[in-house]
């Protein structure tokens, strides 16, 4: 099963594509969609087109996207919601089912600790996917979103259905203890 994870943002939208087979996670692609300094409609169009292109190029079976959190600044929350909406439209226009997860669910599923830092997310994603280099924070969050969806058990045949991430970590000689990855 191929999963496309999206970390929405108005300026930078992260994406990550993984393949899931049993307890195995395999990296396919990751990166960011950068919007130009332009009016809101142009930026939202760039996000929609970018996500639509990813769906065509990578042919995922399912998608996962981060839910909007309520920020102190309501204007920022509204803009993030619009960026997220453009990304969801790109996913749905490609016929994908879309799952939504909170930042807390993402961090708990990937790192084992709901208040994990960006660097902890990057490190865990790097280890889980056997990457040679560490992805940027937006791409790492998007890859983490795909891993979270695989772990959720809501994907048929995904790693979350039987045993969660523990077997995948154990194969690498790793485990999570007090929110930290240890050997």
Curated annotation (Swiss-Prot):
The keyword Lyase appears for this protein: no
Gene3D superfamilies: Ribonuclease H-like superfamily/Ribonuclease H (3.30.420.10)
Residues bound to Mg(2+) 1: 7, 138
Residues binding Mg(2+) 2, per UniProt: 66
CDD domains: RuvC
CC cofactor: Mg(2+)
This enzyme's EC code(s): 3.1.21.10
Subcellular location: Cytoplasm
Co-factor binding details: Binds 2 Mg(2+) ion per subunit.
Reactions it catalyzes: Endonucleolytic cleavage at a junction such as a reciprocal single-stranded crossover between two homologous DNA duplexes (Holliday junction)
InterPro entries according to UniProt: RNaseH-like_sf (IPR012337), RNaseH_sf (IPR036397), X-over_junc_endoDNase_Mg_BS (IPR020563), X-over_junc_endoDNase_RuvC (IPR002176)
GO molecular function: crossover junction DNA endonuclease activity; DNA binding; magnesium ion binding
One BP term from GO: DNA recombination
Entry keywords, A to Z: Cytoplasm, DNA damage, DNA recombination, DNA repair, DNA-binding, Endonuclease, Hydrolase, Magnesium, Metal-binding, Nuclease
Role description: The RuvA-RuvB-RuvC complex processes Holliday junction (HJ) DNA during genetic recombination and DNA repair. Endonuclease that resolves HJ intermediates. Cleaves cruciform DNA by making single-stranded nicks across the HJ at symmetrical positions within the homologous arms, yielding a 5'-phosphate and a 3'-hydroxyl group; requires a central core of homology in the junction. The consensus cleavage sequence is 5'-(A/T)TT(C/G)-3'. Cleavage occurs on the 3'-side of the TT dinucleotide at the point of strand exchange.
Oligomeric form and interacting partners: Homodimer which binds Holliday junction (HJ) DNA. The HJ becomes 2-fold symmetrical on binding to RuvC with unstacked arms; it has a different conformation from HJ DNA in complex with RuvA. In the full resolvosome a probable DNA-RuvA(4)-RuvB(12)-RuvC(2) complex forms which resolves the HJ.
Family: Belongs to the RuvC family.
The protein, known as: Crossover junction endodeoxyribonuclease RuvC
Organism: Burkholderia ambifaria (strain MC40-6)
Record gene name: ruvC
């Amino acid at each position: 099963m191929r999963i496309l994870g999206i970390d929405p943002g108005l300026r930078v939208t992260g994406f990550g594509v993984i393949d899931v087979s049993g307890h195995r996670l395999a990296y396919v692609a990751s990166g960011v969609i950068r919007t130009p300094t332009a009016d809101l409609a142009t930026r939202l169009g760039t996000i929609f087109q970018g996500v639509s292109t990813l769906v065509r190029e990578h042919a995922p079976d399912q998608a996962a996207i981060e839910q909007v959190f309520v920020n102190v600044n309501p204007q920022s929350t509204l803009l993030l919601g619009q960026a997220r909406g453009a990304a969801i439209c790109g996913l749905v226009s490609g016929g994908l089912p879309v799952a939504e997860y909170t930042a807390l669910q993402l961090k708990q599923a990937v790192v084992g600790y709901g208040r994990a830092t960006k660097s902890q997310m990057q490190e865990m994603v790097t280890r889980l996917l056997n990457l040679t280099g560490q992805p940027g924070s937006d791409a790492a969050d998007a890859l983490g979103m795909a891993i979270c969806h695989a772990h959720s058990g809501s994907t048929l045949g995904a790693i979350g259905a039987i045993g969660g991430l523990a077997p995948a970590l154990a194969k690498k000689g790793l485990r999570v203890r007090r929110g930290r990855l240890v050997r």
